[in-house]
Amino acid sequence: MSQARPVRVTVLIDTYNCGHFIEEAIDSVLTQDFPPEQMEILVVDDGSVDDTTDRIRKYGDRIQYFYKSNGGQASALNLGIARAEGEIVAFLDGDDYWLPGKLQSIASEFEKNPETGMVYHNFFYKREPSQDLKTAEGLAGFSGFLPDIRNGLLNYDLYPTATLAFRRSVLQRLLPIPECLVVQADAHLSACVVFIAPIAYIDKHLTVYRVHPGNLWNWGGNTPSDVNILEGDPAARARMKRRVITTREIGIGVGRWLEKNGFDVNRPDVRAFLMQWTLSSNAAEFALTPPGRLRFFGHLLDQSRYAGTRMTWRHKVVHYANAFGSLFVGYRNFHLLDAGRLATKRSLRSMLGRS
């Protein structure tokens, strides 16, 4: 009986002005305990003007390096995927890095089920310049065909680029990524793939996601404290404006892809799945321009309505009560009161010895 052919993996690193991080990213791939003959490394440079090129040249023919004019992450990923030859394509941003065992873990997961379209996993994050690794809280991981899992679409969280790997034959059905997505372009892929193939989640920390000043997604952006930060930082305001636009464009792009491929976008869970980008975009916009009471009330009402199918009746009562309460206290006071409530809840749980 013949043995199965070893899986071949393309590691696709997209980068832009990450010269001070890129070597750590590449080295984290080269030091993986994975046969080199089963791996190719592609670096797509989206027009860096720092020393990225010089740093990458040191690696010689171990790296396939593609330099292009600046067009955003979607254009970089589209180019890289078109050049990929592996059966599996694993992503890595130039400012993040992998941990030992990453490649072998995802390759094994794909080999378990030939139908699996995407494998993703848990991760650490670190805030520069600190070396402390922390775990993101409140994120869910799923395995299976998401539309068949009760509330699967509503509870599905999108993970960072460096945690994602796709079967190339499935990935090609999701292309092209809309090139208006200059950042977080992989969200289009991980949002669409769940409708055409099962996914698999590995509950291991196999990647480090780096948070630094140039990172667009480095805070929540939907509380009064964020408003105060943005008011004194023009560069941060510019990044947040781009975040608002990009988040909306992701939702629009996913909706168009679903309609083009014959999916029912009016199915309640699909409609709620798409609505999350509008709600997230609105929340980020509020950090730029705090909303009036009526608009904030409408936002909270939409949150309650579209998340309602995954709530218990008690949660629904609380959410709707909060929405109507916002009419009396307004945006800033609502978040201050909510922060106080959560702090009190954490203190009580700590006193009772609960995690």
Predicted regions and their residues:
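C-terminal subregions of glycosyltransferases and related glycan-biosynthesis enzymes
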Residues: V183, V208-S355
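Short beta-strand/loop segment that forms part of the nucleotide-sugar
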Residues: E37-G47, F66-S69, G94
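Glycine-rich, basic loop-to-helix element that forms the pyrophosphate-binding segment
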Residues: K68-A84, S105, D148
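A conserved acidic beta->alpha catalytic loop
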Residues: S28, D45-D54, D93
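A conserved hydrophobic helix/loop-capping motif in glycosyltransferases and polysaccharide synthases
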Residues: V9-F21, A25, Q32, V44
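Short aromatic/hydrophobic "clamp" motif used to bind/position activated sugar donors
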Residues: V89
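Conserved nucleotide-sugar donor-binding catalytic segment
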Residues: S143-N228
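Conserved donor NDP-sugar-binding/catalytic core segment of glycosyltransferases
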Residues: G101-K134
